[in-house]
Curated annotation (Swiss-Prot):
This is Large ribosomal subunit protein bL20c. Disulfide bonds: none annotated. Gene3D superfamilies: 6.10.160.10, Ribosomal protein L20. The gene is rpl20. It comes from Pyropia yezoensis (Susabi-nori). PROSITE patterns: RIBOSOMAL_L20. Belongs to the bacterial ribosomal protein bL20 family. GO terms for cellular component: chloroplast; ribonucleoprotein complex; ribosome. GO terms for molecular function: rRNA binding; structural constituent of ribosome. Binds directly to 23S ribosomal RNA and is necessary for the in vitro assembly process of the 50S ribosomal subunit. It is not involved in the protein synthesizing functions of that subunit. It is found in: Plastid, Chloroplast. It comes from the Eukaryota. One of its GO terms (biological process) is ribosomal large subunit assembly.
Amino acid sequence: MSRVKRGNVAKKRRAKIFKLAKGFKGAHKCLFRTAKQQVLKALRYSYVGRKRKKRDFRRLWITRINAAAHNQGMNYSTFISALKKENIALNRKMLAQLASNDIQTFQTVLETVKN
């Protein structure tokens, strides 16, 4: 049986991990075993973070809509339920952008819902 030299394969495998570990501190970027552990941990955190980002932005939008609705004398839950009854198809992201950037349009939507 012939001998298989794995130098290039092993080097490429380690280089791939070290490339992902770029920007880490200390042994986490220099030593292969710790770098690999930290890369796996970072990838796990980034996966969870992508899921969390959706929740966080939805909470932010709801907070902004609630604050703008409170300024006009209506709370968030009644505002959203009134939007549903009127069949106004504006999502929370759009409403939050209206509430923060274009308050006149938001007030128009709120008045439409109130009546």
